[in-house]
């Protein structure tokens, strides 16, 4: 992600319908599938961007953000969130340092050479019994100009994501498509409408109340009704005990 993309993200992240809905989805998944989580929770946001979601995660406990880009770190630290310059595939923390690691729309970036290596590294710094909250863009058919604007180079099918998580050692969780109601509008827009040099965030803002309502409707069903398609994949996975570690 370059400086222009970070500027746009910082400008819209707090109130844009996409990020508001994404935070609601994340909260729903955590509350539904991890009610017994530690309180407070030690949280690492691996790929914090400009910090809107990182600051939101502080409701669960103490949170630290990491990102390799100076613009991201500056924006996140301005929110009062501790930050460290690092990449998801080389985290400067001891084994088992966190109860929850979040990585939201990160491992699809060009900067991430191996999603599986990053998922393994996130598992290393998560305590046994801790969780990973992961979101990635879904379905290669939806690839479009916005992906290129944010330097996204991969989209995942559900089976592919489950395989990556399994091979990285994550177990016993929930993973599935989200934003099914956005699938057709997104496909049509990316196939028929002229490309936007600044990605999708600005040009979809005018429909914010409609799209937010669509996503909030789906959020009520999250974890109850499996969706066959969606524009994103969301997962909450458990880190099983490492060999030789206590249960």
Show which residues each predicted segment covers.
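Conserved N-terminal segment of class I S-adenosyl-L-methionine
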Residues: 1-94, 100-104, 119, 230-233
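Short N-terminal helix/helix-N-cap motif within the alpha/beta-hydrolase-1
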Residues: 55, 111-115, 144
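Short catalytic micro-motifs in class I SAM-dependent methyltransferases
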Residues: 105-109
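A short glycine-rich, Lys/Arg-flanked "PGG" loop and its adjoining helix->strand segment in the class I
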Residues: 116-131
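Short, glycine-/aromatic-enriched active-site segment of Class I SAM-dependent methyltransferases
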Residues: 132-154, 160-163
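Conserved S-adenosyl-L-methionine
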Residues: 170-180
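A C-terminal cap/extension of S-adenosyl-L-methionine-dependent methyltransferases
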Residues: 182-247
